[in-house]
Amino acid sequence: MEPYYNKISKALLKKFKEIVGEQFSFNDYEVRWTYAFGGSIFNKNWVPDLILIPKDAQQISKVLNLANKNRIPVTPRGSGTSLSSGSLSPYGGIILDLSQMNRILKIDIENNLVEVEPGVICDELNEILKPYGYFFPPDPGSSSVATIGGMVANNAGGIQAFKYGVTKNYVMYLEVVLPDGSLLNLGSNVLKSVSSYNIMDLFIGSEGTLGVITKVGLRIRPLPRARKLGLFIFKDVDDLQEAVLDLRRSGIIPNLLEFMDKLILKAVTEYLGGEFFDFPMGYVLLAEVDGKSLREIDEEFTNMFNIIIQKNPIFHKVAMNEIERERLILARKANLPALSRIRPNTCVEDCTIQISKFSEVIKKIEEIPKRINAKNLLVAIICHMEGNLHPTFLFNENDEQDVRDFQKAIDYLYREIIIPAGGSITGEHGIGKIKTSYLELEHESNVIELMTQIKKFFDPNMILNPGIGKGDSRELNTPNIKRSLKNQSNGIMELKCMRCGFCISCPSRMNYQLETYSPRGRLCLLNGLVHGDLELNDLIIEVFHTCTLCGLCQTKCPAGVNTIEIFEKAREIIHKNCEKS
């Protein structure tokens, strides 16, 4: 029998509010609207029915127990940066905003261990660990806002995965609340223990479908004291691949090995200017080694450099100090804002391949627009060189043909390139709400059935993050990507917000502890007002006037959205509307 869900009655609403407290429970439509958006460009007006902000595992246990008994869907959410719509709620129900469970509970240097709540931010954890000389190595592109709970749920990696691995390599133990409200303690605080089945690993990468993570024990490592970076440009991607394969054969393990294609280099050059104008166009390989001392890394870097140079790059530059290193790394970090200047919309995909098939796959991805006869669609490619590709599609969401071409391109990518190459449809972003239809291409039917059985064992009523493809094969409506403000007649400037969430470290958001009061939340409200989904009211007026116009969000925004100008203009329009009424 297909799972079914109930609406939240007034009586249930009262009970949920009693659990977390009135001030941490929100059912205003305007607040719920802002939680219908996340880091993905996709949405389908999946507006939740209730937002709850719990403070501990006991509150979460009571919420889940009540929700399970009454068949109310529950979706855990950290910072809402998922690029696969993982924290959106297609069936309504409750969003559990875990961002305020953000305490570091223990730092145990002697045992190389930290214990944290799920809402702790990755970069903030590393800032606190730095004086101890330790760090937590996984570093996703969203590390400035990514929560540890979200990183565990998606098994996040990052640009140092080539050497340091991904999140699962560092999780020692978890505290998890199951859908029925029961609490599990999994794993161990010692490095070796085989006294049970490895149940903990089921929850790492489960995307919040089996339980809600409420505590994480993480292994930490000594912070490297020295590092050295080189940038190499190749005319031919085959030569670049051979350089990487030779590095692997040598036993040298760079802490950073990153690829950028020609389109990204061109975009970054125009975006950053300066010395980048002296770089020839080609395929970029960024390679870095780190270690305990300059002497140690100088020898290893020289060996790495000599291996790469043998494959005849057309250009190379070695960072001689930290300032030069940061400048070269900026070429990698600036890819999204640079690409967003070419087309209004960017969609970053996520897939993995064997590195021995790298150049073959890159060439096929570059051919996608031609293969599907797309006139305006562009594709750029970035890659963590352990084999984790991020093809990025550039298009205009207000052009219906562009949208159709984009959707065809995604389909072609997975069906005609990644799966035939023996790859995986996701390496670190997750299946989310948008890749379920591709699961059967990668996994045999008995494996998918086993995933379904595991899901139903832990969550028989299917209340926890429904819509995620793992264990839930129900098809969702095709997500809608028309969600931003472009060329509006009411005078609001063009907006290129990617919903990435990098702006959520905002003073008013920190004060109100609610997504709605973040710059992204305000832009979502503006979106609703412009498209007629929302009507101006006192709450929306208050949200816009709590913005201090400090400009912090502008410094954080990869797309360069001029939030100050937009919010000032929005206030003017609000004032005019208030005067008329």
Where are these regions (language model features)?
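FAD-binding subdomain of flavoenzyme oxidoreductases
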Residues: 103-258, 464, 480-481, 488
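N-terminal flexible segment immediately upstream of the FAD-binding catalytic core
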Residues: 1-65, 81-112, 141, 264-274, ...
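Activity-critical C-terminal alpha-helical subdomain
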Residues: 182, 436-486
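Conserved phosphate/anionic-ligand binding catalytic regions in large, soluble enzymes, centered on
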Residues: 82, 87, 151-152, 197-214, ...
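Ferredoxin-type iron-sulfur electron-transfer modules in oxidoreductases and energy-metabolism complexes
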Residues: 404, 476-494, 509-581
